Amino acid sequence: MTNIHNHKILILDFGSQYTQLIARRVREIGVYCELWAWDVTEEQIREFNPTGIILSGGPESTTEENSPRAQEYVFNAGVPVLGICYGMQTMAMQLGGLTETSDHREFGYASVDLQATDALFAKLNDNLTASEPKLDVWMSHGDKVTRLAQGFQVTGITPTCPIAAMSDESRRFYGVQFHPEVTHTKSGLELLTNFVVGICGCECKWTAENIIEDAVARIKEQVGDDEVILGLSGGVDSSVTALLLHRAIGKNLHCVFVDNGLLRLNEGDQVMEMFGDKFGLNIIRVNAEDRFLDALKGIDEPEAKRKTIGKVFVDVFDDESKKLTSVKWLAQGTIYPDVIESAASKTGKAHVIKSHHNVGGLPDYMKLGLVEPLRELFKDEVRKIGLALGLPAEMLNRHPFPGPGLGVRVLGEIKKEYCDLLRKADAIFIEELYKADWYYKVSQAFTVFLPVKSVGVMGDGRKYDWVVSLRAVETIDFMTAHWAHLPYDLLGKISNRIINEVNGISRVVYDVSGKPPATIEWE
């Protein structure tokens, strides 16, 4: 079996919003990597035994006395090191150079003139008509390196940054003031490939097929002949987890699908058809709609709704697990960003942003071991693995759906009537986006039920019914988003269909709020 962890890159996180992008790019190249906090110990680095190290950017200033510093062992480990933005600055300073606050901050596009072609910039040139090779890059910095450490040379400059790139080829230390990990840097992926493959010598073994083989082997080794229980939601993560476990242990996997009454139109039947009929998994379908709706009565605050939905899920799942007396393991679809964001992860720095509705919070007395086959993977990698396992692309590439489901798309108190109306309206919206070839042009689209009524006219009669809002956004990372400029005729068609086909809705509005200041979801 291929050892997919033999060659690996260690990324030290100094707090940049782009740090996870570095890891995703390295994985895209085909090499395993892990993302750790900047204050990792020498012992931890030695234990990880990286083939190369990348120092990320960050919001701090190296001119401040207590700003983060890389562990000294990073520069004594005998492996190549690449510093990006803040990572370059701390490398320069820690090795004897000098950094200062720049008079001219650089944010946005810039053109770097290459002064020397080292191994990092080999065969890179974005402007073939210029007298000297140039790179189109993305800058985001307020400090700059003003004096090189001994052994370094300047390899790139901009009009306002005299040391935009540097290298010490003998020690295989490299620094760039720009961000090669973002798509705005034209040859960024090629630069990272030069470092990871060309300089570090990593082999590209991190592929979907090899990851599946490795995951199946590790599951078999971990659980043996024991039985495993999994909460299957029909989402990407739990679906891929289910198929990996099924491939590894077959009928020893028991999937529990909790139908909470907060799913999309016909979603429960689709899950059963896909995983029960097509893939032959053991699935227990629990119709818990009444239980969830009863618990949610009178609750209108968003976070309270989330917590209630999470608690009821745990209670329902616990009831079902008690019936499976021979189960010894609990499987979860935890993915790598969850690990990074969790306070319990090895980074030790990130705080919990929000908990998933089916992750964590399970009773201690269940005393089950934990199986997390996706723990090392980013979402795009999970999708690739799902495709290789036979899941349809349409399912894997569906827009994000919140853990609490329609519970946070019905504003205020949740009632069955509201959910039923919302399901029908949302299904029409999504259907028309597919028909008009707009579904994959937007990053996320959904309908929100507003607990207000509006006057309408139907034939000769007056109606006083509910209002829904359509929401469609375009985004790269979901940290910021623009509202999607859907064609007016498409919006008109969707509105007419909803008002005419969904009895109980009299008005459709379109949300034109960006993020920020608004969030993508309404609650």
From Swiss-Prot:
Enzyme Commission no: 6.3.5.2
A molecular function annotated in GO for this UniProt entry is: GMP synthase activity
Q: Which SUPFAM superfamilies match?
A: Adenine nucleotide alpha hydrolases-like, Class I glutamine amidotransferase-like, GMP synthetase C-terminal dimerisation domain
Under the heading PROSITE patterns, the entry gives: GATASE_TYPE_1, GMPS_ATP_PPASE
Record bears the keyword Repeat: no
Active-site residues are 85 (nucleophile), 179, 181
Q: Which GO terms describe its cellular component?
A: cytosol
| Keyword Cell cycle included in the entry's annotation | no
Q: Which UniProt keywords apply?
A: ATP-binding, Glutamine amidotransferase, GMP biosynthesis, Ligase, Nucleotide-binding, Purine biosynthesis
Q: Domain named GMPS ATP-PPase: which ranges?
A: 206-398
Q: According to its UniProt record, in which pathway does this protein act?
A: Purine metabolism; GMP biosynthesis; GMP from XMP (L-Gln route): step 1/1
| Lineage: superkingdom | Bacteria
Check the record and name the Pfam families matching this protein: GATase (PF00117), GMP_synt_C (PF00958), NAD_synthase (PF02540)
This enzyme catalyses: XMP + L-glutamine + ATP + H2O = GMP + L-glutamate + AMP + diphosphate + 2 H(+)
The record's annotation in NCBIfam families points to: guaA_Cterm (TIGR00884), guaA_Nterm (TIGR00888), PRK00074.1 (NF000848)
Q: How does it assemble?
A: Homodimer.
- Role: Catalyzes the synthesis of GMP from XMP.
Protein name, please?
GMP synthase [glutamine-hydrolyzing]
Q: Which organism is it from?
A: Actinobacillus pleuropneumoniae serotype 7 (strain AP76)
